[in-house]
Amino acid sequence: MCGIVGLYLKNKKYNKDLGKFLTGMMNNMSTRGPDSAGFAIYSTERKKKYKYSICYNENNIKEIKKNLSKEIKDAKIKIISDHFVLETSLKPVKVISIIKSYDNLNLVGYGSSIEIFKQVGNPRDVVNNFSLKNFSGTHAIGHTRMATESAITTDGSHPYSTGEDECLVHNGSLSNHNNLRRTLKKKGIEI
């Protein structure tokens, strides 16, 4: 049992309230998935800029930030709870390679408009930890999870990044996950 919410705003005057709207929706779904939660926020596309949503598993974020800023000269880093968003004009192939060189960093999504955040814990706590109510954007998707067949981890939390400016949430187990995994790997998608 999980909860899925989504919101697409057709009127730009509400973009500043997207996080507030999604917070209420996530809170209402808390009982359907009390183990962990996550959300993806889409904002207006920033031409020639990419945003990388990264979860870090170490307390020394200042050192990580300093090192990344040396490797990615135009990096702007915004820390939010145990995640940060790195913005740069460098192409994804280069930045993803740099991020993967750090054992304590986990890339959870990237693109010119998407930011993804997820954590273990009650969804009410998760949305508060990330101050979701303060986010603005054009559309969003959220997920509350009740782990039934796998461990309760941030990696197991949704949304899952499926590519540049793409994400996926699902409700229930995928009985053909091994076939899907093999098919995706054959197409060059890293899992």
Residue ranges and their predicted role:
Residues 1-191:
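Conserved short alpha-helical segments that host acidic/polar catalytic motifs at enzyme active sites
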